[in-house]
Regions:
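N-terminal anchoring/stem segment of glycosyltransferases
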Residues: 1-72, 226-228, 238-253
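A general structural motif
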Residues: 1-2, 72-74, 98, 217-219
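Non-transmembrane alpha-helical segments in soluble domains
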Residues: 30, 93, 181-185
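A short acidic, often aromatic-flanked loop/helix-cap motif at beta-alpha or helix-coil junctions
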Residues: 46-51, 108-110, 199-204, 229-230
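Short, surface-exposed amphipathic charged segments that create phosphate/polyanion-binding patches used
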Residues: 56-59, 115-120, 208-215
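Short, flexible, basic/aromatic active-site loop/helix in glycosyltransferases
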Residues: 117-131
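Catalytic core and acceptor-binding pocket of nucleotide-sugar-dependent glycosyltransferases
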Residues: 132-234
Length: 253
């Protein structure tokens, strides 16, 4: 039995350039897993028609996918493919206390508040929780105790799919992230928030995403999201490639 890092990397034929940089993410996590005696699992195939269920929701099937693949696991990290991990990142599984772990979403608060307010009003009957406990879904640690919890979210999604899709299209809000947040707080799942350095989102806005690689000096997991003027994911590719090669040399293997 081992800890698992789970990622979803599915090529969208309509936006083929989007996945180009993700190999740098996967390879960085593969090296980290080898160093820390963990297993990497990358889902690269559709399990639903994309018009019915977008791939970012596939993360909810992590337990079923691992078990159907015959993988016996202890804890799981579900990580987004636009992250690169520092090779010396501490083993965060040892910090979990067997709780559901995440990192506060410290990025665009307009987007966070818009997601929070509209999901609360239109989907969760006015339920509220502290905005400072609203987390980013790009780095989530869980274990077998959370399997039924995820099954509940899946059931809820399909019962409310049309409303959820309409909320996303109408208000430009998050997809799986707000729903997971509301479920964690509504069902009183024991949550441990880890420091920002384990999911460094929105680095451009924090003025640390520069060629001096300052961001690599202050944290462990670099999340290359919310980069402005990012046409065809060119800047995502630039930064993920540069970061990977900064740690591992010029060969992406």
């Amino acid at each position: 039995m081992s800890n698992v890092v789970f990622m979803v990397n599915i090529k969208n034929e309509n936006v083929p350039t989007r996945v180009v940089p993700y190999e740098y993410s996967i390879n960085s996590w593969r090296k980290w897993c080898d160093k820390n005696d963990c297993q990497l699992f990358v889902l690269d195939e559709y399990i639903f028609d994309s018009d019915y269920l977008r791939p970012n929701w596939y993360k909810l099937y992590v337990f079923d996918l691992l078990e159907n693949s015959g993988i016996d696991y202890d804890q799981i990290l579900v990580a987004d493919c636009d992250t690169v991990v520092h090779p010396d990142c501490p083993n965060f599984f040892e910090l979990s206390e067997n709780k559901f772990c995440a990192v506060h979403n410290d990025g665009s608060y307009d987007w966070v508040c818009r997601s929070y307010e509209n999901y609360s009003k239109h989907l969760f009957e006015g339920f509220e929780f502290s905005i400072w406990e609203y987390f980013n879904s790009g780095f989530l640690i869980m274990n077998k105790n959370h399997k039924q919890f995820y099954q509940n979210i899946i059931k809820f999604y399909f019962e409310n799919r049309d409303l959820i899709v309409n909320l996303q299209d109408t208000f430009g809000v998050g997809t799986d992230q707000p729903v997971i947040n509301f479920f964690v707080h509504k069902e009183d799942v024991e949550l441990k928030l880890l420091p920002y350095r384990f999911n460094m989102q929105d680095m451009f806005r924090k003025e640390i995403l520069h060629d001096d690689m300052l961001f690599t000096k202050i944290g462990w997991v670099y999340h290359f999201n919310a980069i402005p003027n990012n046409v065809d994911s060119q800047l995502t590719t630039y930064w993920m490639k540069k970061t990977y090669e900064y740690f591992h040399g010029g060969k992406n293997d």
